[in-house]
């Protein structure tokens, strides 16, 4: 066996063997327990970053571990290939989005393979391929016919730079998530998926996901936002209609002093017809986003409409205002304003001099009435007892809720109602690089779904990309005939939100070669996904949409389980220091390879200089690796220098998977040193100790029959004790402590002074017996160690196994099992205390009786010293732990 570790040779050899044998190709086998392990598929941006490496290594470690546990494992890979970056790249580089995407996927596939992932590449999919999105279009037409997809004109978030609609979740602080442009509100006809029809189920079945992080489930619960409240009707002053509002605080109804409506509300539009100033304000409001998150930060603005409504219980006239903090499309697009007990209303009322009436005295707030001239305090919004509310005075929250709801219902002016914050999913995008919406517009027949036999509606690839969608400028593509009447018609030129593709890809992996159906019975074998791995940033967008889409497929008879992902692991970020200089009021960031960093003895940064000029640079915060902060590390360069196993080992050892991983060059060096040492020590054993015996002699089947030297027996006990803890840690995905266990085992096997040293023995049978004892324990130790470490560093472990067990495959060996008999100890060490203070330790037989333990303790020199000849009052023995002598 080669004595020097050469990662390039080792990894190329292992990957070639895996590729040629097809060992990771998954096949359905009803006689075996399946395990479907999936990491969120990447967008083919061109190059892997360390976030990718960590994500896919975590998934691969789990997949390989489950494979060694004997399960039938599926771990596929593909490309989330539609999206705006491809269009932007096409404009910048003069290539088509399809060519750019394919080239990037080809390059990233090579990078992923260099990591040694146990992926079934035969199942690779790309969402931009017609054979994939054909079935998305097919399901769209079925859902459209059922009314679960519908078209309506609605106010949307319009990104003026990308010229497309954004979902509420894609608006961050009032700006588009990709372009960063301030969003506008526009009324656009678009298609919606009726996710609200599944709101109750999506909420309730979160309780059926114990394998999900509680944080993710809480985020989804809050986003779905189920609330119990009242619908309240405020009659128009002239009695012509009623203004409907929804409130979760009917107990504050008597404190309503005005009503606020959204700029798009019919009452607002009617009032603006003969009021140019009001019309201008409505237009201004259209430049705000439609996401609730914006409301907390935007300046509250409003304008009186000159219209009034009547309070349903006390008959007071309340003015109607247009307010920019009221969203059209959420609830009724109108709110009853109770400034004394709602922070937004309080701010608005103070700004515009509107009345503020206290109607609740909080049980936790020390106030009798709201201080209208002071600032807002949170206690104003707390539940309490009604005051200044007529017959409702003194009622607690629920009592007032029920009484007011009953009175409203009796008057025909309201009722109790349950409402969800969740809104239907607008999926139309005015972009080119996406799945075409399979609808044909006919002047006679209306919107007609494309018949199944005409699917897929293929996206043309020879296009010129500029602002907006080129499809609208291609009559040769959109001009067609109506499937119903045969008359002239036009195709829909909008494409689907790319989150639609990522909402069902996990299911298509089970049968990617099926050209006759979206899914087949193979999906029943593999689904649900047993372990899903991805970032918590997808908690609402992707994970909620995927759960919804899964239920759509279930109700269409395509899948037969309720949830797509049984267990979810949300990995932490990869973070690293930042380095910059202030130039012209802006920070110019430098990459880690551009600076010389000085550190203290613990590796903490002390300062940094720029290599090019030797002048200092500022060491900034430790932040997520990103292009904008220029603090990323190139995985490809690391793999070229150290090998994939070193990169994998470091990313698993540096932090638990669900926590942030702080990058450390010295940590990578340390991981490389460990693998070199593992190889060197294993080679030493194979070339020397093991070479003296046949493999059958080294493989022990009954350890009770093998005489072991005392130190080897103790070493074996430690190895199995460490393995037992590592097994527990693997199940909990604490891979960092698994690596620690591997290091501990190697330290035992590499102990030349203790484990291998037999210089004190004379030549002859005794020394030969010692050497054989060392060899069989070391052979078992390396056998256990290579299998324990295999999921994390598979290439080196595969190579070492072939040296340990020529002609066999480490995957066939299975996961190492703990020998409980090896854990038994002849003697144990106990702590000895005198009057509760530590005074020493004693060694006793493992099976010693309580009386024997007491005798040994009382005879101990340290105990005799501290009891000073006094007879003990009592002796407390805690089995296996300590003895406390009370003198």
UniProtKB/Swiss-Prot annotation:
Record carries keyword Protein biosynthesis: yes
Protein keywords = Aminoacyl-tRNA synthetase, ATP-binding, Cytoplasm, Ligase, Nucleotide-binding, Protein biosynthesis
The record, for Pfam families, names: Anticodon_1, tRNA-synt_1, tRNA-synt_1_2, tRNA-synt_1g
Q: Which reaction does it catalyse?
A: tRNA(Leu) + L-leucine + ATP = L-leucyl-tRNA(Leu) + AMP + diphosphate
Which EC class, in a word?
ligase
Listed transmembrane segments:
none
**Motif 'KMSKS' region: residue span?**
624-628
Q: Which residues bind ATP?
A: 627
Q: PANTHER family, from UniProt?
A: LEUCINE--TRNA LIGASE, MITOCHONDRIAL (PTHR43740:SF2), LEUCYL-TRNA SYNTHETASE (PTHR43740)
The record's InterPro entries line, in alphabetical order, gives: aa-tRNA-synth_I_CS, aa-tRNA-synth_Ia, Leu-tRNA-ligase, Leu_tRNA-synth_edit, M/V/L/I-tRNA-synth_anticd-bd, Methionyl/Leucyl_tRNA_Synth, Rossmann-like_a/b/a_fold, tRNAsynth_Ia_anticodon-bd
User: Where in this protein would one find the motif 'HIGH' region, according to its record?
Assistant: 42-52
Q: Which family does it belong to?
A: Belongs to the class-I aminoacyl-tRNA synthetase family.
Q: SUPFAM superfamilies, per this entry?
A: Anticodon-binding domain of a subclass of class I aminoacyl-tRNA synthetases (SSF47323), Nucleotidylyl transferase (SSF52374), ValRS/IleRS/LeuRS editing domain (SSF50677)
* Protein name, as recorded: Leucine--tRNA ligase
What PROSITE patterns does the annotation carry? AA_TRNA_LIGASE_I
One GO cellular component term: cytosol
Q: What is the lineage of its organism?
A: Bacteria, Pseudomonadati, Pseudomonadota, Gammaproteobacteria, Methylococcales
Q: Any idea which GO molecular function terms this record carries?
A: aminoacyl-tRNA deacylase activity; ATP binding; leucine-tRNA ligase activity
Localization of this protein = Cytoplasm
Q: Does the keyword Cytoplasm apply?
A: yes
- EC number(s) recorded for this UniProt protein: 6.1.1.4
**One of this protein's GO BP terms?**
leucyl-tRNA aminoacylation
